[in-house]
Amino acid sequence: MGGIKVEKIKIKNLIFSYPNSEKTALNDINLTVNQGEFVTICGKSGCGKSTLLRHLKPILTPHGKTSGEIYFNGKSIYDLSDREQAENIGFVMQNPDNQIVTDKVWHELVFGLESLGINSAEIRSKAAEMASFFGIQNWFYENVANLSGGQKQILNLASVMVMNPTLLLLDEPSSQLDPIAAHDFFTMLERINTELGVTIILSEHNLSEVFPLSDKVVVMEDGKITAENTPYKIGEELKQNSMFAALPTPTKIYYSLGNNSGNCPITIRDGHKWLEKQQINEHFEFKSEKNRINTEPILELKDVWFRYEKNSDDILKGLSFKVHENEFYAIVGGNGVGKSTALSVISKINKPYRGKVFINDDTKVAVMPQNPQSLFLKKSVLEELYDAVFDVEKEKRKNEIEYVIKLCELDNLLENHPYDLSGGEQQRVALAKMLLRKPDLLVLDEPTKGLDACFKRKLATILKSLQKNGMTVLMVTHDIEFCAEYADICAMFFDGKIVSEAPPRKFFAENNFYTTSAKRMADGIIENAVLDKDIIRALGGEAEDLTETNDELNYILPKKTVIKQGKKEYKKLNVHNVVLGIVFVILFVMTQCLFCGRYDNWKNYVAQTISILFIAVAMFNLIPRKKLGKELIQNEKSKRKISKRTKIATLLILFLIPLTIFIGIYYLGDKKYYFISLLIILETMIPLGFAFENRKPKARELVIISALCAIGVAGRTAFFMLPQFKPVAAIVMISGVAFGGETGFLVGAITAFVSNFFFGQGPWTPWQMFSFGIIGFLAGIMFQKGILRKTKTDMCVFGFLATFVIYGGIMNPASVIMWQSNININMVLSSYVMGMPFDFIHAVSTVFFLFFATEPMLEKLERIKIKYGLIE
């Protein structure tokens, strides 16, 4: 009699949609995962796999509209405390670098335990246990930066498992790893599941490694679960599904030959045994590979040596190879051997200290980096595409964009922010940008990373079509199967150089470990079989030859697709703008050299003010500006009511904080300014306590406030050499308008306090904290009431008046109060008169920073608020 199955996770009718999105990311999800099971979730890019996984750890759940229930050990998952989540639910992310937070391996390993307050003896014991279990004792004290991608992912896994979770979630953990590192990683997962009994749920595109480990496979499409079964039976359900191409090689071959789900092989070993029993077509011959293209090299590297630091080890060690015109050249190799470094040298990002890189002068090169996010500069996919063809005439530009949207399947992503897309979707957008540049040489670094099997086929067809139209492709990848089927030449990269190269069949047939699944499955049975279709054809089946390109995929053949003209144009720079900009930069430098530090008469003050205008005019001419569409620039009438916490903050700021400063001056003799400053900060944080009432504040809410304070401090420090030329008031105003008056005051107060550690603390610190703080508070209140709008004009006018009247109006008499014992009206008036030139320069500089910073900063902060549901 079998034991009773204990439900670890139970999801009932889960529906989720992201903010400002009509499409549901998760649609009526129902799923049960029992204790100790290994469950694999698969599906096309953007189908909702990552979103579903993040719902299983509430602290990582994305902001949006959610309905339905999720139970963990029979208890609502939303009732788990942060500590219970950290201890019981582990999460390993797709990119190893995104999860590492410390500099040393052992620091990373114990970070979670230290955060939970575990005592030192227990931490040492658990760290030693994990290091031994995961085999990281040999690099226990190593710098994290020196680790390979596989080691980093093992470290992330160990750092999660040291907390002893009972549920482990993994989001495409092998997407950054080479095949051998991925195999080692999944072997470790198998041990965790079988030896420790940990329940594992992971999403993955590479199913060959995870199928044999899985108890259940879940297939998702458009936010829904479309299939759910054991690995041995799921293949039959997917015969007519696009996900069939993602199945492991033995499974795919088995069902392609018309078999039913009786004894379906899912491992290479099972596939090999099954293949031994099959009737092989003795007269079958593989299609002969073409000879290498006999054309001039479009790219040649000769004895290239490169290192990142003068005294560091060489990364490239005598690298030499040629890529001929109209060739598809693929480079494979393990993590950390120098493949991406070689591409950086080819693209001239880095320069070798020895050797030569030859590229024809008229060769147009486009490089798609390993991280596609480094290409994204705009706030929507459509804007990114327009940015790639900004120099193309309008009508032709539209046709090319319409074509590439259809080609790369971006129709439903055009209004999305590139950073909100899944990894595979980001790869498609990056590829589209590269195609729009129409290069002669297309350089791709891990282009299949994060792509589902269906779009990999589409990518292959695109690349072969580009070749047909005369383009040369150089690709670095871990995807052995992709190289074997579509490349013309494959090369092995090891120890800083290429050690072997050959056509794919010859290249992979001679390898025993770094080779395709089909080759390992057919080893000793079908000689020289490298691809799935080789085995299928040898057994008398039919297989589609995807390398034959479609006529309709001829490059830049326009296809009519309806796209919204929501793009925000940028004003292009011309020679006139550039010349004017350079002239005014020179005038600014000359003025500063002649008048810096001179404040002995009014003429010098005027000169300083004029110098600010010079640099403003220069930046106005040199920086492209947006032609913005109509957006929300004024707070809605329904949201203009002042909240309870804002009223409390008003009382604190207008009465309690001035009272604190007064007591500090007259009862503490102005000598306890550190105490007074800290007291002001504590008083400022009281309204935020009301903001977090009845809910759990997330770390990101505090991080964004800290980041704004850091920007203010860094800005004040960066411009220390220019008297009164400071961005602090501008940053504080923007903070208040974006997140409310209380946040504005807090940012102003903390910025003044922290920056004075660099400029000197003293009795003036509380006064500066109050002055900057009240500017941020008033900016927030005025926007809340609809008086102040999010426009350059409104912000600049308010910034000038606030800095000149409020900051100057407080700090000028403060100088008298701080240093004079017998104060009279003449002293106060004199302080105003003497301070006006300084206040004027400060006010003009605030206008300067607001003019250039208002739109980009408010745009980004607004996006952060919407995406993460932050408070105002």
Identify the role of each PLM range.
Residues 65-75, 355-364:
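Conserved ABC transporter NBD signature motif
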Residues 121-139, 386, 396-413:
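Conserved ABC ATPase "signature" region
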Residues 143-147, 417-421, 425:
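Conserved ABC ATPase signature
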Residues 168-171, 442-445:
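Catalytic Walker B motif of ABC-type/P-loop ATPase nucleotide-binding domains
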Residues 204-205, 477-478:
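H-loop/switch region of ABC-family ATPase nucleotide-binding domains
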Residues 220, 224-254, 497-521:
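Conserved beta-strand-loop-alpha-helix hinge in the C-terminal portion
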Residues 239-295, 514-568:
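ABC ATPase nucleotide-binding domains
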